[in-house]
Amino acid sequence: MKKNLLKLISVMLCLAMILSASAVIGSAEGESETPVIGEFEPFRITVTANGDTKTQKGFCWYTVSNTDSVVKLYDANGAEVTDAEITYSDVFEWEGNFVHKAVVSALKPGTEYFYTVGGANGVSEKGSFITDDGNDKFEFIAVADIQASSDENFAKGAETVRAGLKTMPGAEFIVNLGDFTNDSTNEEWDAYARNVKDIHAKTTLVPIAGNHDGLGVWDWFNNMFSLDTSESVQVRNGVNYSFDYGNAHFAVLNTNDLLSVSIAQLKWLENDMNSTDKDWKIVFMHKSPYTLGKDGKWPDALYLQKSLTKVLDRCGVDLVMSGHDHQYLRTKPLKHNKINEDGTVYILSGTAGTKRYEIRPFLANHFLDTDFIAALTVQKRGWGNYWNGSDWEQTRQSNIGGCFNCISVDGGTLTLKSYILADKEAETDPEIITQHDELVLTKQTGQNKITFTGDNTTSEFEYYIGVVPSFLMLAVYAFGEWLPKFFIMLPALLDSVINKDIF
């Protein structure tokens, strides 16, 4: 009896020691995966395009507790810059943390600045950015749809962006075409920011709102970045804004606006594009007018294809880059929904993340004419995922990975090169980057003229007055064009669902 009691005590002590060790290890692992943020430590720090890119930047950061907002700038020699003007927004609470925003202006063009953000109780490490020098030669990177939920998948998305910076080290800003997260929660935004912290610390971000960036709570996207909202038609679930860089004019659309893009936003875009004489006109947006992705079968995609492209045609837009469908597709130049060398090229920019979608071949020649396709790459193994110019083929093995796009502008030449960072089977595997597409556009410079000089703001009254016509326009497209196309496509769709489990 006594021996059995001693054995029982020994076993219980061993179990206690094992459980204690497990708790310590588990705690340590938890801390390594989710570091504890100090009460006044700045986090989720971003520097964004905000207004005049030669002289101005937007700053946004968070703290756990309320504290003052301070941005400090330094030159390349480490001396504090005192001649910049800094305008701070009121600090406000959001989802359990406090949001700090500032706009820094009176900067010098073509200058590298270093900065810290924070307050009296906590200051960030130094970051850096460069202002536009106004010259006609510059480079930038574009990615889309990191859209992760786990720290592991955010890390993989961040590696894709780093591969972009390694491939194009002279990139002056990074465009994120939306869906930063999957469910837009505190935990996911923290994981995103934690994994791209080193990237955001040395560049300017051009963010675009994705449909996943405000799920459940609309204001998430707008509270993550300091953006120029002076002409935005609404500021709840995304922002539309524009800026110049070099000899290019960029407009950012918000496809979370009513039916993807409201009539008010279409009007804003046309006025905006007609108010510039820059050589290149480029539009960034999340959803795409031309796609073979899973959402290409719904009325809002056709609505974009019919309503938005008319504005782009009239304004002479050269390039549209989008995300949303987690695959890469480039169209030939299109105008009036036909191939035209003077038209607009549409780029569905692939996914930088790990969620990758098959194409839907049943959409072909119903919602996207296959003759329009210049390049198509799907980053996922599966049936019929590559378009070779005349037929669907199996996915190429080299295309299995995250996608990033490097764009350079040099006067009258714009070059886009798209790359895949191959997935690794093991951490020790070498990094393999493969170029899978290239676009070169050329034009004569100095040809664009300013034709609009008026006020391009939209009052709340004007916006809501346009809601009914926007829905009527969708109804016309839905019942007049989408529904007949859908029923004609239906047998192929059902075959895809039954035989390939692809909807």
Model-derived regions, located:
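Sec-dependent N-terminal signal peptides of Gram-positive bacterial secreted proteins and lipoproteins
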Residues: 4-26
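Metal-dependent phosphoesterase/phosphodiesterase active-site architecture
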Residues: 29-70, 76-81, 89-91, 96-99, ...
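N-terminal active-site segment of His-dependent metallophosphoesterases
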Residues: 40-44, 51-58, 63-67, 93-95, ...
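Hydrophobic core positions of the immunoglobulin-like beta-sandwich fold
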Residues: 104-105
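Metal-dependent catalytic neighborhoods of phosphoester/phosphodiester hydrolases
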Residues: 151-156, 180-197, 214-226, 293-301, ...
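Short, conserved loop/helix-junction motifs that constitute active-site signature segments
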Residues: 168, 196-202, 338-341
